[in-house]
Amino acid sequence: MSIEFRELYRKPEEGSKNKLVVVTGISGSGKDYLLSEFAKTDYRIGTAISVVNFGELLFSRLRQVDPGNDMVASRDDLNRSVSQDVIRVLVNSVVDEVIARQPAIVNAHVAYMQQGSIQINPDVVRKMAVTSFVYVWSDPELIAEWRKNDYGRRRDPEAPEDIILHQRIALESTRIIAEVLGAGFRAVYNRTDNILENISKLK
């Protein structure tokens, strides 16, 4: 088990960080698939250790407080149909739920697109007091292709050159936040042919 995930199995100590590992990266970088394959290698993942999709929790919370909002049909609509003020309020309640479900692996965006601009909220990860971050990144052309072929999602189109900038900002932001908060950090380069190699880095 890598140092990033090993802390999830240890008994909590007074004053220690929460037993949370955030797996992050821009949309379409392969986080979901990597996590699903990683979970198959350890029966405790999904049972003793929760696997939480922050965006899905956020979407569910919005449906609870505003069930008549037809503009938001999935988590992909959160970044274009919900104001930043509403998102901020909902995020705080979702963070409380995530903390309550630790130890957990959290699939989340540290830097995310909100109505056409990249948003970063270090207060959220500071409140979560995570053990470590795992940043999943990939080739921009490959990300664009994965997004195109993922018919179950409704992502906004993004050219490869924009993906380069978005991915670099997200990567460096996550690295800096981890350093400032004293959390662990690991970057994983994701390709179609190295899933087993990446899983071995996390085990």
Model-flagged regions — what are they?
Residues 23:
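Hydrophobic anchor at the beta1->P-loop junction of P-loop NTPases
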